[in-house]
Amino acid sequence: MTDDNIRQIAFYGKGGIGKSTTSQNTLAAMAEMGQRILIVGCDPKADSTRLMLHSKAQTTVLHLAAERGAVEDI
């Protein structure tokens, strides 16, 4: 995959407006169409990736940075 093929989508806004639901449904549809997708949840209080993983605790960006150094170093 070249950089020309990479697309980024951001969902943002105040809490409770459906960002997680919209992002999960959009990405699920894209995956079903054969697209390779990556979701990065950056809300330390309500990370949307746990919705896809049935509330299983996952390593977060904050944990990764704490283990490996600054985000810029990763």
From Swiss-Prot:
Q: What is its EC number?
A: 1.18.6.1
Cofactor mode of binding and number, as noted:
Binds 1 [4Fe-4S] cluster per dimer.
| Any one Gene Ontology BP term | nitrogen fixation
Entries under InterPro entries matching the protein: NifH/frxC, P-loop_NTPase
Q: Where does ATP bind?
A: 13-20
Q: Name one Pfam family in it.
A: Fer4_NifH
What GO molecular-function term can you cite, just one? metal ion binding
| Reactions this protein catalyses | N2 + 8 reduced [2Fe-2S]-[ferredoxin] + 16 ATP + 16 H2O = H2 + 8 oxidized [2Fe-2S]-[ferredoxin] + 2 NH4(+) + 16 ADP + 16 phosphate + 6 H(+)
> Please, which domain of life does this record's source organism belong to?
Bacteria
The similarity annotation says: Belongs to the NifH/BchL/ChlL family.
**What is the name listed in the Swiss-Prot or TrEMBL entry for this protein?**
Nitrogenase iron protein
UniProt source species? Nostoc sp. (strain MUN 8820)
What gene does the UniProt entry assign to this protein? nifH
